[in-house]
Amino acid sequence: MNEADFPEDTTFGVIGICGANCNLVARILKDRGFDVIGTDMSSGDDCRFKKSLEGYDIEVFYESHPEEFFEKADYIIPPISLPKTAEVFDIIQEKNIPVLEVNDIIDIFKVNKPVFGITGTNGKTTTTTLLKKIAYDNNIAPVEHNLEKMQGNAEYIPILQSRLNGDVGILEVGTFGVPGTIERIVGNSELTSGLITNITPDHLNDLGGFMEYAHVKAEFIKGLAGKQLIVNGQDPTIMGLLRELNFEGEIITFGVDEMPVGVASKECVCGKTIDVKEIISGSGYYLCECGLTTPQLDYIATNINLKNRTFELHTPDEKLEVKMLLEGIHNVYNVVGVIVAAHEFLKLPYDKILESIATFGGVSGRMEKVATIGEKDVVVDFAHNPAGVETVLREFKKLYGDITTVITISSESGAEGDLEIFNKVLEFSKYIVPASSASQKIANDKISERPELKEKIILDHGVDDFVKKGTLGATFDEVQEGINQALNLDCNMIIAIGEAATKFKKCVNNL
């Protein structure tokens, strides 16, 4: 069955239209010119994604599945989560209405535009958001899922999003450490090209080891075989996977010419340990016994002035003067990757790209200043894995000197990840305020081992009883109390890190 098999006057009935997947399905079908009606057991006031249906002529029945809905529908699309034993399936069978599953919609209604995917451990959201801004600034409309407070990199969302109306697709491709997820997103979103920011340890609790995680990310490379791939050439994991998979397609590399901040070990794809002269965590200059080494880069940033937020970019064609509002060397990597993507995928001239970059203030929850209280600035950042924490805190210390770090993280790599994060915070911070239960446990152990750390680690109560949800490691009250404690210390720059810090950033309004 394909799209042409449905007459123009076909009416599709979508059950569970207040849920993310069926909301997107309804909008796809309406975008393709069909009649769509919806139903949901939620009330109109409680319909989570009701706002995204505004502008669509879709009749929605709330709080019930009325007879009228089934009388009007030529086909029914139920939500994935609805069990086949549900009473509504008895009604569908009794009325002999054909059923299409969400996966049928994906198979039948093909992607009709170029689609670009962005993956990696850190930097995905900033890269995706900036590339979209450049598109909008140049009258190119990227598809938007418009699902309020949804990040949008979960499996079905990017796949369905790619089928909505728009000139191009620009998709963040994430994984919760589940093998096969990225493969399905890349294939079903019909990516034409993509970008990998970096690959550093994450989700180790689910996968067991770094190489297992890296090979989940490698599904992105496999899915783009024969196509265009833009990569951070200073990440040995990415370059090692490209070699291991014998990638046959166009590879465009980018990186940064900067003095390394130190040397760290990283597992090479060959199985050996490789010393990386790091510019940011996990990326820099490297040479492994297996022969893997930093390549000559196609795009390279030089003469970086972080204070003035400027750098020169050497492209295959010319040298560019780049001005940005973003802070930190990690954002130089992000901006360079975006420049390459905007030029190669969006086919925009450099001058148009640079104009847009110069006015990009960043993404909510990424190095975001949320308050100035007295003489103290409070910043939140989503950093939630060891590499992300190290990179962000190193840049903050470089830019501002002494910092107080409030930890709200519960690592997706379990206790090992929590300990590694705490050690990174210990390295770069004047003071540490452990606000998450996971960090408080480690703080107790650290102080027991080294009592002198009481001056640095501010822990004036026992371990909070909090059950983590993903990387959400603290409650609203715990984040607020942590920041409040930080305000009483003799340090004027406070950074609260982790998902809870960004989710509950409005807690500063009460301080």
Language-model-detected regions and their locations in the chain:
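Short, ordered loop/turn segments at secondary-structure junctions
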Residues: 41-42, 65, 104-105, 147, ...
